[in-house]
Amino acid sequence: MVSAIVVAGGKGKRMGTVQSKQYLSLNGKPILYYTIKSFLDCKLVDNIILVVPSHEIDYCEKEILEKNSLKVNKIVAGGDERYDSVYNGLIEAKGSDIVLIHDGVRPFVSKETIENAIKYSEEYGAAAPGVMPKDTIKIIDDNRFSIDTPNRSHLISVQTPQAFKFDLIYDCHKKIKNENVNITDDTMVAEYFGNKVYIYPGEYTNIKITTPEDLIIGEYLVNR
């Protein structure tokens, strides 16, 4: 069984909005609508688990799912940190062979990217899409002076869905709760315990909508 965990616990801080960014409108539909529909449209995904803040569960059921005729298998309350939310989703995904973990504000993930996540995680145990940065990347010191320029050919901007054999990522998430480490995504959780993650080619259109500028790009993409 293949399960997709859609993590939709983001706030509107960088977006500058009161409303959580996953509920902002793109062409008359909430961002989260497009994200969920992407997984519903992929026949290889058997199970969809939506993780949202506990106080938003009722809103999400009525305003996102019911109003837009969407169905998920389970809505789960998130935790204080992102990895807590993912772990809550993983508990509901027990029995899965493969689990995909996806940002709720990446609405333009393609069917091909989802299918490749499944394929490569089955082969390698852990996989994620990524794209090469278009800009030169600098490492700066605390005073914002450039101190190094990494070789761009070895740099990747990692996206989601990040896919894993279930037992691998579940065991890692159970253990990471006892570690004092700053975790920003699930590939880091896997890598922290010595697992290799295969990075396959992603798509530049698979953007994470975080800022007002992203919303403008999103409006263009949804109307292509």
Curated annotation (Swiss-Prot):
It catalyses: 2-C-methyl-D-erythritol 4-phosphate + CTP + H(+) = 4-CDP-2-C-methyl-D-erythritol + diphosphate. Transmembrane segments: none annotated. Its EC number is 2.7.7.60. The keyword Membrane does not apply. It holds the Pfam family IspD. CDD domains: CDP-ME_synthetase. It is an enzyme of class 2 (transferase). InterPro entries: IspD, IspD/TarI, IspD/TarI_cytidylyltransf_bact, ISPD_synthase_CS, Nucleotide-diphossugar_trans. Pathway: Isoprenoid biosynthesis; isopentenyl diphosphate biosynthesis via DXP pathway; isopentenyl diphosphate from 1-deoxy-D-xylulose 5-phosphate: step 2/6. The record marks 14, 21 as: Transition state stabilizer. It comes from the Bacteria. One of its GO terms (molecular function) is 2-C-methyl-D-erythritol 4-phosphate cytidylyltransferase activity. GO terms for biological process: isopentenyl diphosphate biosynthetic process, methylerythritol 4-phosphate pathway. The record marks 152, 208 as: Positions MEP for the nucleophilic attack. Keywords: Isoprene biosynthesis, Nucleotidyltransferase, Transferase. Belongs to the IspD/TarI cytidylyltransferase family. IspD subfamily. HAMAP family: IspD. Catalyzes the formation of 4-diphosphocytidyl-2-C-methyl-D-erythritol from CTP and 2-C-methyl-D-erythritol 4-phosphate (MEP). PANTHER family: 2-C-METHYL-D-ERYTHRITOL 4-PHOSPHATE CYTIDYLYLTRANSFERASE, CHLOROPLASTIC. This is 2-C-methyl-D-erythritol 4-phosphate cytidylyltransferase. It comes from Clostridium botulinum (strain Eklund 17B / Type B).
